[in-house]
């Protein structure tokens, strides 16, 4: 029997599980605070359990609208099995559906190879004030 994997937007009853997944590495805000600021969260379920999530925000301040990926986190026991790549593939599909141009992410140096493996390109340019890390972009191919 094929394992059950499902990616969907988060629901209210997911937030305790999402907090467990993300709180080790990210500052956590519950959904009601996030959605007011234009944030959306996707969750990845495997065999009925939420094992991963990502937080995105629409970037409309640019003349070329895109998504900003603020976090992508998978439970430690479920890493290196392709689940993060599945979440990224879902985001890429969302970009195409919404007629956006791509996905921006800022990450630590050790994560650059992971994002490059998923077709993100390192952006060379001005450093965003107050933001540490490296900026990468995935561009939708037209």
Model-derived features with residue positions:
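A conserved beta-turn-beta hairpin within the catalytic core of GNAT-like acetyltransferases
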Residues: 59-70, 79, 129-132
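Conserved acetyl-CoA-binding loop-helix of GNAT-fold acetyltransferases
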Residues: 74, 80-93, 117
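Short loop/turn motifs at secondary-structure junctions and domain boundaries
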Residues: 32-38
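Conserved GNAT acetyl-CoA-binding A-motif
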Residues: 95-107
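Short amphipathic alpha-helix that is part of the acyltransferase structural core
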Residues: 1-31, 45
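Residue-level recognition of the GNAT/N-acetyltransferase active site
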Residues: 75, 108
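Conserved catalytic-core motifs of GNAT/GCN5-like acyltransferases
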Residues: 106, 121-137
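Conserved beta-strand in the GNAT
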Residues: 43, 49-58, 65-68, 73
